[in-house]
Design a protein with these regions (language model features):
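Membrane-embedded alpha-helices and immediately adjacent juxtamembrane helical segments
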Residues: 1-328
Length: 328
C-alpha cells in the first residue's frame, strides 16, 4: 500500500491527471456530455423499462420498480423521479394490440440502445479509433446487439444489487437488536463497498466492450476504479446542485427535465474524464489503445500551409479567369 503514496507515485499520478485533463479539454468532452444528455432524454425511459422488465423476470416487478425509483429519487429529486416514472408508465405495452406491441417493442429497443451508441462514438474519438466505413449496416447491427447485451448486463447488475440489498437489510434488522450502534456503521460501510463494486463493474464493461478498440483488462480495471471513485465523490455534490437548481423558480415547470439533463450531463462528464484517464494511464505505461480488427487508428494533426496564390476568380464581363498572388 505504501508504494502508492511515495513521492514518485504521486508525481506519476499528477502527470496522468494532467494528461487526462488536457485530453478532456482538447477532445471537447463537455460537448459530448451535452450531446449524451440530449439523447438520454429520449432513451432513459425505454432503457429503464427494459431493465425493469428483465430484472422482473426473476423478482417482483413492483418491488424492483420501487427500489429503482428510490435510487433515482436520491439522484435527481422527487419531482424528476416522478416524471421518469410517468414516462415509463406511458411506454407500457400491456393492453395494446399485437401490431402496436410489435412496433412499440422495436421502437423501445432502438430508443434504449441509442444512448450506448452515443457513448461508443464519443469514447472512440477520445481513444482515437474509428470503425472502417465498409459494411456500415453490419456495423450498425453489431452496435445494436452490443447495446442490447449491455442492457441485459444492467438488468443483471440491478437484480444482483437488489438481492444483496434485501439480504443485507434482513441481516441488519436481525443484528440491530444485539448491536444497534455498531451494526448501523458496519452495514453503511458494506453498502458503500457494494455500490462501489457494482459501479466499477459497469464502467469496466463500458470501457472494455463498447469502444472499437483493444484494451487489456488490467488497464480497464484501473480506469474503471478511478472513474468509480470520481463518480462516488461527485454523486453527492451533483445531487445537491441538481436539487437546488431543479427547485429554483427560474426553470418553472421545466425544473424536473432540467434536473435530469443536469444530472446526466455531469455524470457523462465524469464518464468521459474516466475514459481520458484510462487513455493517459495506458500511454504512461508505454502502451497504446489499439483499434479492433474492424477499426483503424485516427491521428489528428494541425498543418499550416502558405498560400502563394489565391483561388481563381472569374471576370463577369469577359468570362476569363483572373489569377492573383498573395501580397507579402
Amino acid at each position: 500500500m505504501k508504494k502508492y503514496f511515495t513521492k514518485q507515485a504521486l508525481k506519476d499520478g499528477f502527470n496522468i491527471m494532467k494528461a487526462a485533463g488536457s485530453g478532456f479539454s482538447n477532445d471537447m468532452a463537455l460537448k459530448f456530455s451535452a450531446s449524451l444528455a440530449y439523447y438520454t432524454v429520449f432513451s432513459l425511459a425505454p432503457l429503464l423499462l427494459l431493465m425493469i422488465s428483465l430484472a422482473g423476470l426473476f423478482l417482483g416487478r413492483e418491488a424492483i420498480q420501487g427500489e429503482l425509483f428510490k435510487e433515482i429519487n436520491g439522484f435527481v429529486g422527487n419531482d424528476a423521479a416522478k416524471q421518469i416514472q410517468d414516462m415509463i408508465a406511458r411506454l407500457e405495452l400491456t393492453g395494446k394490440s399485437t401490431t402496436s406491441v410489435i412496433i412499440g417493442s422495436i421502437t423501445l429497443v432502438i430508443g434504449a440502445t441509442t444512448v450506448f451508441g452515443e457513448i461508443q462514438e464519443s469514447i472512440n474519438i477520445i481513444w482515437q479509433v474509428k470503425a472502417k466505413p465498409k459494411k456500415a449496416w453490419l456495423k450498425m447491427l453489431k452496435d445494436r446487439l452490443l447495446s442490447g447485451s449491455l442492457i441485459i448486463s444492467l438488468g443483471f447488475l440491478l437484480l444482483v444489487s437488489l438481492i444483496l440489498n434485501g439480504a443485507l437489510s434482513a441481516l441488519n434488522d436481525r443484528l440491530r437488536t444485539y448491536l444497534p450502534d455498531i451494526t448501523v456503521f458496519i452495514f453503511y460501510v458494506i453498502n458503500i463497498v457494494l455500490s462501489f463494486a457494482v459501479i466499477t463493474t459497469l464502467f469496466a464493461v463500458i470501457f472494455k466492450v463498447l469502444p472499437d478498440a483493444k484494451i487489456a483488462w488490467k488497464d480497464v480495471r484501473s480506469g474503471a476504479i478511478f472513474t468509480s471513485i470520481l463518480f462516488m465523490l461527485g454523486r453527492f455534490l451533483i445531487g445537491i446542485y441538481v436539487e437546488s437548481s431543479a427547485n429554483s423558480s427560474t426553470y418553472g415547470a421545466a425544473g424536473s427535465l432540467i434536473a435530469i439533463l443536469l444530472w446526466v450531463y455531469y455524470t457523462a462528464a465524469i464518464l468521459y474524464f474516466g475514459a481520458e484517464f484510462t487513455k493517459a494511464y495506458v500511454d504512461f505505461k508505454g502502451k497504446r489503445i489499439e483499434p479492433a480488427d474492424y477499426a483503424v487508428h485516427v491521428k489528428q494533426m494541425e498543418v499550416e500551409r502558405d498560400v502563394k496564390k489565391l483561388p481563381k476568380k472569374i471576370d463577369k464581363e469577359t468570362g476569363k479567369s483572373i489569377e492573383s498572388e498573395v501580397k507579402k
